[in-house]
Amino acid sequence: IEQELPKDLEQEIREAFAEMSQGEDIAVAVRSSATAEDLPDASFAGQQETFLNIRGIDNILIAIKEVFASLYNDRAIAYRVHKGFEHAGVALSAGVQRMVRSETGTSGVMFTIDTESGFNDVVFITASYGLGEMVVQGAVNPDEFYISKALLNAGKPAVIRRNLGSKQQKMVYADEHSAGKSVKIVPVDKAERNQFSLSNEELVELAKQALIIEKHYGHAMDIEWAKDGDSGKLFIVQARPETVKSRESQNVMERYILKEKGDVICEGRSIGQRIGAGTVRVVNSIHEMDKVQEGDVLVSDMTDPDLSLIHISEPTRLLS
């Protein structure tokens, strides 16, 4: 991080940002984009760093170096080993993207397939207040919506299911604007928690865009979106192939039978359709990874990308 960027590269970055900002004090996201990212069988999602609400060219230059360095963080190295990629064969760029004011609006992720069952005739949309990282990281329980592709294409009411999430927290801009200090997490008002974060009209518009993107790429897609709280406009900020359910056979249905019965000690939103058993290990931070042994059931408060290190090194099951 202390190493200086090549002078010609730094000058090009400064000139490009000056053209983008036109003298305004704009907030940008500095995002990673690797040459091996978003392949049909390996998404690399969340393996490298992204920094939000970065302001000022000096902070942007530092954030770019942080992104470059994240190509060799622990989880990125472990993921490449797991997927069989040569370290030297993966290059990384840093994109500087003007931010949507979703900190005062909503954001989330949508899939052109049901991520639980693999049913491909719906668009599945998740939404919560504030910046989208909370949804992407699994740090918040978002609203969930299912939109029928057939009804959407027929011009009929297409929202067929809505699940109200707790949406207890949101990520917003912080007062500082440097990498690692530019965002903060605050509680969501009770009134907002108790109402859906998107209208039916907004859901239909997002779903239409999702189908356009899916048709363009010819593949089930994983799409990040954001709503500007100031203008009310919806934006697509990223799209990548969906790499899990879309690769499973559509001609096979697996069912699992629980052979023993016991007391229910906790319930939550299902993220899969399998049954696991083993010794429960509660992990409060990535620094407690050494607790986890092969076959354990890992319990964590959220699905942090760093936990992929545990999945790769030891076969485990995750409960968050």
Regions found by a protein language model. Give the residues of each.
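NTP-handling and nucleic-acid-processing catalytic cores
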Residues: 50-151, 156
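Single conserved hydrophobic/aromatic residue that forms the stacking wall/gate
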Residues: 311-320
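Conserved metal-phosphate-binding beta-hairpin within the catalytic cores
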Residues: 46, 219-243
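Short, flexible loop/turn elements at secondary-structure junctions
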Residues: 34, 98-100, 129, 200, ...
